[in-house]
Regions:
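Transmembrane alpha-helices and adjacent helix-loop boundaries
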Residues: 2-375
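The feature captures the beta-strand-to-loop junction immediately N-terminal to the Walker
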Residues: 424-426
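Helix-to-loop junction immediately C-terminal to a conserved catalytic motif
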Residues: 439
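ABC ATPase NBD Q-loop/coupling interface
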Residues: 448-467, 505-507
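Catalytic Walker B motif of ABC-type/P-loop ATPase nucleotide-binding domains
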Residues: 556-560
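A short, surface-exposed alpha-helical micro-motif characterized by mixed small hydrophobic
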Residues: 596-598
């Protein structure tokens, strides 16, 4: 999803969205004050009901936090219950000190402890408790995320590690000697900031504080989604490799949102504890973290408001089931998960977005016949560059093997400045491996690689190589399908690609002009706001080429750029490459010999990881070794 549902609704129906939001907010603000009414008043609510709704609001904050990492960054955490519980324990320490006064907490006296553990120091102060609420879960999340993302752990392995982390925390807190109350945890709270915890006025204040946290969390999520940072997270989820080849380091973005998410959970846990009156290790149970994932899945990932509703629906149903039919709750929860997976894979809220009809979709994907349009104006100096012939890329004796299979054997190759080099060869010749080596995806065992006369590619990673000026297009067009055409080009542009820049930076007029010019060159101007996933195959090919062009690279590596294109699209692609050659150096891997004939400047034939022949297309076509390889004689 390109934008969260709340943003989409605001754009499509601003008045309706505003009214709905205001009515809901007013209702939640008024709700706790109904607890002050006499018990026999028809509008009065009980303290139990107020506590239940406050607890659900805390869970809603957790759902938003999980949606930020799972719905946007694609990181399924099964351990957010740990951060929630740590925030609760930090608040519980403060409440236990308030209840004990100058003495030891009750559980410590029961265990015959004579003094407070060192880590309880200062816990009687509310400000220090707030610091613990934020710093302890935040630091743990940062350290865990740093090593996990640095090790490139992702997918199911990341989920398993988060589940193991929360399970380890639960086992640790179950032990009496750790100083956290063991199996019973913390309870018996009496005072908070000088007010009785059980007083109705205190519960109203806690409810309103929870509501403020929920609104702030939702507003923060919306703000992030509107920034370039939110679009980068979406790109991490949908095509992390493409993002790296655009020059971004995903680790920093994932670490930032992961730590932020943990802190939000901790704040929710801190407000949860004084409302329910207890915190124990069961809050760290992996089951609770899995339930949180169900809230997000039910409401709709990447929608922000959906997980809030999902948390409300599931926990409202849980409260009813655990009283009416407690033995069936787990079965009901499993049924919800199965139904959502089978019938609502995008979540219940996402169903509110009506899919386009086949006619509408077809109509939107059709664009003017390419041959009927004038070629895009591309400024270049082909003759000037082609006369230089200084090598932009030099490979010497490159060897790559995988488990004894030699993908590249003593391969040597030079690409000149402004040259358009075509690489051909049968399947398995090493063409894609060659591109992997040049872009840092695969490290050669031996050999020398020099780019632009002074860059040693063998010591650089993919991100550094992208910043140095090498752009790569993959065999299968790889774009950020949840983002618009314009946003794909925006992310790929050559500029600062740090977390801070993505949070604060905005496009200037020069950058917008570059995107507009690129869209015109690619014949995609009319589709600038189209979601990239709705483009035709050929249009995706053009978009990916455009993502390379806005990076302003010196060397473009293009892997089967004409594959799957129509004849008209193929013809225009050939024209485009001929115009680009000179301003850029191009290395094109392609099987379509008709396409090769229209662009061939110099052709290299690979076979079994070695250079078999080089020269003009006519020369390699007459080469006996090439004929033998292609025709088998």
């Amino acid at each position: 999803m390109n934008q969260p549902l709340t943003v989409t609704l605001t754009q499509k129906a601003p008045l309706t969205s505003l009214l709905l939001g205001m009515v809901t907010l007013i209702a939640l603000i008024v709700l706790p004050f109904l607890a002050l009414l006499p018990a026999d008043h028809p509008l009065a609510i009980s303290t139990y009901t107020l506590t239940l709704i406050g607890k659900i609001l805390c869970y809603a904050v957790v759902a938003i936090a999980l949606d930020l990492v799972w719905g946007y960054a694609g990181l399924l955490s099964l351990g957010h219950g740990l951060f929630f519980a740590l925030g609760g324990y930090a608040m519980g320490m403060y409440l236990m000190r308030q209840a004990a006064g100058d003495g030891l907490p009750a559980f410590m006296s029961f265990l015959s402890w004579s003094e407070l553990p060192w880590f309880w120091s200062g816990s009687q102060y509310f400000v220090w408790a707030l610091c613990l609420i934020v710093l302890v879960p935040g630091l743990l999340a940062f350290l865990f995320g740093y090593f996990a993302f640095r090790s490139k752990i992702k997918g199911v392995y990341f989920s398993i590690m988060t589940q193991a982390l929360t399970y380890a925390g639960m086992l640790l807190f179950f032990r009496n000697e750790t100083g956290f109350g063991g199996n019973n945890g913390f309870t018996g709270f009496t005072m908070m900031l000088g007010f009785p915890v059980s007083a109705t006025s205190t519960r109203i204040a806690l409810f309103l504080a929870t509501l403020v946290l929920l609104i702030a969390s939702l507003a923060l999520g919306l703000a992030l989604a509107r920034t370039k940072f939110g679009r980068v997270l979406t790109a991490v989820r949908d095509a992390e490799n493409r993002l790296m080849f655009c020059g971004y380091d995903p680790k920093g973005f994932k670490l930032f949102v992961w730590t932020l998410s943990a802190v939000l959970c901790a704040l929710a846990g801190a407000l949860y504890v004084p409302q329910v009156g207890i915190i124990n290790p069961s809050e760290m149970s992996p089951t609770n973290s899995i339930e949180a994932a169900i809230w997000v899945a039910l409401g709709g990932r990447g929608t922000l408001i959906g997980p809030v509703l999902g948390a409300g629906i599931v926990n409202g149903a849980k409260s009813w089931f655990t009283m009416a039919m407690p033995e069936y709750w787990q079965f009901f929860l499993g049924l919800i998960f199965i139904l959502v997976t089978l019938f609502l894979p995008k979540g219940a809220i996402a169903q509110g977005e009506r899919p386009m009809s086949r006619f509408q979709l077809t109509e939107q994907l059709i664009y003017a016949e390419i041959n009927a349009q004038e070629p895009g104006a591309i400024q270049h100096a082909a003759d000037q560059y082609r006369q230089q012939r200084d090598p932009v890329l030099t490979l010497e004796n490159i060897n790559v093997s995988f488990d004894g299979f030699h993908a590249l054997r003593n391969l040597s190759l030079q690409i000149g400045v402004g040259e358009l080099r075509c690489i051909i060869g049968p399947n398995g010749a090493g063409k894609t491996t060659l591109m992997d080596v040049i872009t840092g995806k695969t490290r050669p065992q031996t050999g020398k690689m020099v780019y632009d006369q002074h860059h040693d590619l063998s010591t650089m990673n993919t991100i550094e190589i992208a910043h140095a000026g090498i752009g790569r297009k993959f065999q299968k067009p790889t774009v950020f399908e949840a983002l618009s055409v314009f946003e794909n080009l925006e992310l790929a542009q050559k500029n600062h690609k740090t977390v801070w820049a993505s949070l604060c930076g905005k496009l200037n007029s020069e950058q917008r002009d570059q995107i507009d010019e690129t869209l015109a060159i690619l014949r995609l101007s009319d589709l600038r706001q189209r979601q990239a996933g709705l483009l035709s195959h050929g249009q995706k090919q053009f978009l990916e080429i455009g993502m390379l062009l806005v990076q302003d690279p010196h060397l473009l590596l293009l892997d089967e750029p004409a594959a799957g294109m129509t004849d008209a699209e193929t013809a225009y692609t050939a024209e485009l490459f001929n115009q680009l050659a000179g301003k850029h150096s191009l290395m094109v891997v392609e099987h379509d010999m008709g396409f090769i004939e229209t662009i061939a400047d110099h052709v290299t034939v690979l076979h079994q990881g070695q250079v078999l022949a080089e020269g003009s297309l006519a020369e390699v076509q007459e080469n006996d070794q090439v004929i033998e390889v292609y025709l088998g004689r």
